[in-house]
């Protein structure tokens, strides 16, 4: 029904992107700033130079830190730890980056893992939007959830969008199902990408800007319509038209458009690119 609350996973990413761009419009950061200006924990990141047949990585120094533009377009070099078997993704799983108990702990764990490639040289679906969530908190002085509530959800009248439902809406939360190959049938999911399903009725230990929100179809439609309208809905302006246009403009050079997706299930082609926290059509 229209009242059903869903875990929206990576549809959280454009919301975090809007939060970032609100702060961008306030002059809190610039696209070509090094991310180390806001996350100094990343100053000593190493980079994978090569991988041997037995999976051992040869590392080198960063030629330069990733820029804010690159963390918003998945070209910074971070891994994710989802389905891919790249050694960096394995380290994300081993260090339980996606199970961190705070965004600071998440950043500290990422800081111990090398980048997959030199910043700006490739595209890889990554944990960079979770890093953006940490930056939103640092620049705003609020938790990510508080900032989103104050600057996005309340103004747009999105009452059912948050990082948890609370007990009063628990009965409206849709279950997640998956196909169990061993049982040969569809069952309720207990894990996703090897991570235990969190209790979405309670506040999370770490608010994931990359995939932690719950929402309804009607709430998310209002968010989407705001973007389609150039940053405004029902007389409430969240972003300027120029900023929304900037978000939807491809920022990926042609030489890195065709690249494996970090989840191992998709790839870019010449008709699509990536803007600031969402994919864009380049032939529209």
PLM segments and residue spans:
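A short, well-structured edge-of-sheet supersecondary motif
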Residues: 1, 31, 277-280
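Short pre-catalytic strand/loop immediately N-terminal to key active-site residues, enriched for Gly-Thr
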Residues: 2-7, 204-205
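Active-site SXXK
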Residues: 7-39, 129-137, 220-223
């Amino acid at each position: 029904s229209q009242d059903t609350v869903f875990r929206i996973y990576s549809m959280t990413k454009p919301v975090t992107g809007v939060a970032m761009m609100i702060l961008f419009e306030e002059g809190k950061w610039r696209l070509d700033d090094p991310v180390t200006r806001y996350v100094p924990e990343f100053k000593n990141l190493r980079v994978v130079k090569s991988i041997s047949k037995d999976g051992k990585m040869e590392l080198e120094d960063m030629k330069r830190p990733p820029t804010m533009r690159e963390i918003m377009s998945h070209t910074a070099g971070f891994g994710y730890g989802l389905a891919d078997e790249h050694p960096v993704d394995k380290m994300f799983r081993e260090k339980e980056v996606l199970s961190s108990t705070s965004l600071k702990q998440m950043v500290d764990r990422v800081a111990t893992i090398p980048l997959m490639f030199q910043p700006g040289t490739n595209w890889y679906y990554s944990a960079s939007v979770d890093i953006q969530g940490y930056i939103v908190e640092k620049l705003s002085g609020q938790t990510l959830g508080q900032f989103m509530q104050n600057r996005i959800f309340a103004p747009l009248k999105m009452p059912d969008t948050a990082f948890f439902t609370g007990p009063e809406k628990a009965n409206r939360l849709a279950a997640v199902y998956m196909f169990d190959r061993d049982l040969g049938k569809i069952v309720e999911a207990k894990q996703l990408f090897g991570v235990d399903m969190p209790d979405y009725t309670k506040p999370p230990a770490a608010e994931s800007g990359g995939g932690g929100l719950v929402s309804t179809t009607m709430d998310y439609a209002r968010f989407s319509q705001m973007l389609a309208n150039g940053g405004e809905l029902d007389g409430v302006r969240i972003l300027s038209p120029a900023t929304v246009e900037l978000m939807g403009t491809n920022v990926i050079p042609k030489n890195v458009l065709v690249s494996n997706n970090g989840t191992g299930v998709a790839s870019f082609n010449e008709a699509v690119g990536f803007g600031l926290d969402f994919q864009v059509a380049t032939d529209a």
